[in-house]
């Protein structure tokens, strides 16, 4: 599973928190990998966000519930974490921290820095067959086909 920006955030949350899968009667084994691009992995203090997103509401506990970083499973699936080298600084930092946390739990993690891509142009890489993301994504998926 994967996505860009909010889509990458939701994919990562689904990959590391199996409660959503349980709610729909789906085994965790269906998620064989996660490929977020320019995703948010953490909300709240220390996240680097300059303001609280409206969708979190006013409940402080919602930051934790919405943060893949705070919902990591004991054995997370493989991840290919990508972001642009000119992406928002907090997303670059969060991607690196999240990758390190996943590795500590034994996950197979690859990081891909998309040269000269901003947050917005990083999304285009997902559709460029000869671009910087597609070949790595295909190799990642083949490796984790199961």
Q: Each PLM stretch: what is its role?
A:
Residues 43, 86-90:
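Acidic catalytic loop of the alpha/beta-hydrolase fold
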Residues 30-32, 77-78, 107:
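Loop/turn elements at helix/coil->beta-strand transitions in domains of secreted/extracellular proteins
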Residues 82, 92-99, 103-146:
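C-terminal catalytic histidine-bearing segment of alpha/beta-hydrolase fold enzymes
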Residues 27-29, 72-75:
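Short, conserved loop/helix-junction motifs that constitute active-site signature segments
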Residues 75, 81-83:
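Short beta-strand/loop motif that positions the catalytic acidic residue
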Residues 16, 39-71, 77:
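Mobile cap/lid helix-loop segments that gate and shape the active-site cleft of serine hydrolases
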Residues 39, 83-84:
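Cell-envelope and extracellular/periplasmic
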Residues 1-49:
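Primarily recognizes the serine-hydrolase "nucleophile elbow" in alpha/beta-hydrolase
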């Amino acid at each position: 599973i994967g996505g860009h920006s909010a889509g990458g955030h939701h994919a990562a949350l689904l990959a590391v928190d199996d409660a959503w899968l349980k709610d729909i009667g789906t085994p965790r084994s269906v998620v064989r990998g996660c490929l977020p691009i320019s995703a948010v992995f953490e909300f709240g203090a220390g996240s680097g966000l300059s303001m609280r997103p409206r969708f979190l509401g006013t409940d402080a506990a919602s930051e934790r519930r919405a943060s893949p970083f705070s919902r990591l499973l004991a054995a997370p699936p493989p991840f290919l974490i990508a972001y642009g080298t000119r992406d928002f600084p907090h997303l670059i930092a969060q991607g690196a921290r999240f990758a390190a946390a996943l590795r500590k739990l034994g996950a197979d993690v690859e990081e891909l820095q998309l040269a000269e891509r901003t947050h917005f142009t990083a999304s285009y890489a997902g559709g460029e067959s000869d671009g910087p993301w597609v070949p790595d994504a295909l190799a990642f998926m083949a490796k984790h086909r199961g």
